[in-house]
Amino acid sequence: MGAVQTCFLFVLVGLLCVESKYIKYDTSSVIVPGKINVHLVAHTHDDVGWLKTVDQYYVGSNNSIQGACVQNVLDSIVPALLADKNRKFIYVEQAFFQRWWRDQSEEVQNVVKQLVSSGQLELINGGMCMHDEAAPHYIDMIDQTTLGHQFIKEEFNVTPRIGWQIDPFGHSAVQAYLLGAEVGFDSFFFGRIDYQDRAKRKGDKSLEVVWRGSKSLGSSAQIFAGAFPQNYEPPINLYYEVNDDSPILQDNPSLFDYNVGERVKEFVSAAMDQANITRTNHVMWTMGTDFKYQYAHTWYKQMDKFIHYVNQDGRVNALYSTPSIYTDAKYATNESWPLKTDDFFPYADIVKCLLDWIFYE
């Protein structure tokens, strides 16, 4: 046997002898004063009818149009949350949740009630759908919100704290005061504002504001409100549905493509970038998008790893969070916020748009 072959054999044997070890990921992090705190908010946005019918979206049929099954999302979330008490999730669309709820055994319902009570599962916004804010009459908006809130109160004895209108095309001051502050929300978050407005607000750190939507009611009906830096999706390369192509955090040194240092560096860089356009040391990452978490384990496995290794690195602090936790943290800073008094209309999402949006397609 030649020297090269012998050397190769020793290397191969060495690699085969490396043993993997179980890693207990530390996901118990909480807010750390003085650091940039990255609030990882796990969520799905489930359109109550879009490319498919409501029934098709719920059961997962007609997937030649779009691979989406809300039933899978909710079925998958419950065991994922039970696997780690530090994990959190928010859910919005009551039209789907109530269907799913009626399909569950009393045993599962009791488990979900415990998850809601503990704060692991937060039901936010609370309406049957995420209504448009331009075309509907305000009575219809009130009715569909009331219908959802009544169910949540009756079944869970909680009242949603957060407005979460992330996908309507533009936003109305009426939503801010009548279906925000007057409903009792502590804050209101949204994704779609005009691209020019978003760029300006990034520059002067005014994506988050105090929104005083009623001139007659004044400060008595104002609400803390925030637009996301880039719609309602995660930062680039942090999508982890089972068929997504973002690079995973590979932390097994006995396998190829070990990349903990590289992935942590990317995470910290993205956190710093958002902190530079945000007031206070708290930033929110919306970890999810349309019809995600159909296999929740793939998301939580990666978020567990990021929280563990990013916090070992120490430059920023990552934690499982919810919009309520994020809102409380923002309030606690006693920051002064810009004042907003009018609509976020009209809406265009890119420069080449020929027409501005003022409501749904």
Indicate where each model-derived feature is located.
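Catalytic-domain carbohydrate-binding cleft regions of carbohydrate-active enzymes
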Residues: V18-E361
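Cleavable N-terminal signal peptides of Sec/SRP-targeted secreted and luminal proteins
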Residues: A3-S20
